């Protein structure tokens, strides 16, 4: 076969921190100086387990909606929107290293309880119900993240995970038009 194993093995051991030349050129560190760094697979697994915000369904009208009337939906609760509540930086420890994870929502998949659904990247959505009933509304959030290990810069995590809100039952009623005069 031939060729070099890692690089030219004629390196000067004195300039390689006292390591034999082949180990210095192949990136080996002496015992006690090694830094074990978690890989993308470990970071992605931790990201999927950090307890991301599940979301909460809000609507206008809030308590009851009506057939043929637009109902506006958004994700959040009294404390803020889903993005504001869920996108804070978190730190986990993997293989002895501090890993900072910055999650962010990339899409919202709404299910309106009448068979209708809509996927959006942000903001409010509007839906018009065609029939009366108790509608089980939910939203699934798709998350991605950036991460940094130790003092390194942030980079894309290269994957996604999802969380789904608790179902919110929204009563939808028929409205009767009343004419006066």
Predicted regions and their residues:
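Extracellular/lumenal mature domains of secreted and surface-exposed proteins
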Residues: 1-181
């Amino acid at each position: 076969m031939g060729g070099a194993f890692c690089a030219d093995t004629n390196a000067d051991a004195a300039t390689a921190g006292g390591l034999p030349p082949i180990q210095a050129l192949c990136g080996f560190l002496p015992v006690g100086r090694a830094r074990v760094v978690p890989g993308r697979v470990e970071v992605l697994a931790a990201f999927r387990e950090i307890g991301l915000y599940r979301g909460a369904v809000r609507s206008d009208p809030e308590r009851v909606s009506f057939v043929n009337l637009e109902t506006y939906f958004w994700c959040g609760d009294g404390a803020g929107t889903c993005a504001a509540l869920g996108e804070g930086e978190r730190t986990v420890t993997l293989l002895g290293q501090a890993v900072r994870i910055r999650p962010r929502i990339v899409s919202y998949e709404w299910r309106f309880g009448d068979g209708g659904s809509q996927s959006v990247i942000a903001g409010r959505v509007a839906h018009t119900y065609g029939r009366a009933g108790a509608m089980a509304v939910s939203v699934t959030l798709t998350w991605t993240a950036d991460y940094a290990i130790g003092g390194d810069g942030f980079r894309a995590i290269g994957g996604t995970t999802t969380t789904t809100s608790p179902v919110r039952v929204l009563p939808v009623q028929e409205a009767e038009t009343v004419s006066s005069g």
